[in-house]
UniProtKB/Swiss-Prot annotation:
Enzymatic class: transferase
Source species taxonomy: Eukaryota, Fungi, Dikarya, Ascomycota, Pezizomycotina
Species, as recorded: Aspergillus fumigatus (strain ATCC MYA-4609 / CBS 101355 / FGSC A1100 / Af293) (Neosartorya fumigata)
Name of the protein in its database record: Methyltransferase tpcH
Alphabetically ordered keywords of this record: Methyltransferase, S-adenosyl-L-methionine, Transferase
GO function terms (MF aspect): methyltransferase activity
Superkingdom as given in the UniProt entry: Eukaryota
Amino acid sequence: MLEKVFHEKSFADQYTYGAKISELYAETLITESGIAKSHQRPLIILDNACGTGSISSTLQRTLDERNKRSLKLTCGDLSEGMVDYTKQRMQAEGWNNAEAKIVNAQDTGLPSDHYTHVYTAFAFNMFPDYKAALRECLRILQPGGTLATSTWKTANWCTIMKPVIATMPGQLSYPTMDEINTMLNKGWDRESDVRAEFEQAGFDHVNITTVEKQCLLPVQEFGEACKILLPYILSKFWTQEQRDQYEADVPSYLMRYLEREYGKDGLAPMKGVAIIASGRKP
């Protein structure tokens, strides 16, 4: 069900509404990867599960000219909608030496011992087989290459749905953030577990940090971001009868709640806490 959600065009459209906070975390992820101090040349980078291209765009904006001249960048995602969006962004922003294509992170088909850096932003908690994806990252990295990941610990665009659902009739349930994280890939919201996954996969020099960020979005845009995982979550927590009776009404209850909290033309805070991890291939 979750993989089906990723392939729907509406997912790519809604995902762009969360791009602002993704851009903020992209800067942190790139900094934590240590790429600015890397002596590896040329820089051969995979933006893995690239989404809307936040990592790649930030790299193009922040790398110095010497690094950009040596850069070879591949943006890969399993969602055709995400790849199309990234291609458009690539052209609009004039990225250097970059390509975007369909890539399955669990079986990439990419060459071994090839990349200096692999970035995977907000995806390891959603891969159907994250251990296979970790093995692939290790395989395709050069010796001394770096994997850098981010995963959500908390995200208020998920948790805000609980009080929204409470305003609806029918005594409907909605999960806490801990329950949502457990529905996805358990453990990627805990620092010690993320470290253990990196080390068990074969990475060394593992660094873990937890970072909180927020940005402001117009209420309408924040409302769209809140709906990103809604079909998947409701499929797990509501009966089919409840979905048939109430699911179509959720967006209107959501907007009424947000407009009451922040005003019809107001700004809503988008808040997240993410685990930033990096590790090196021996």
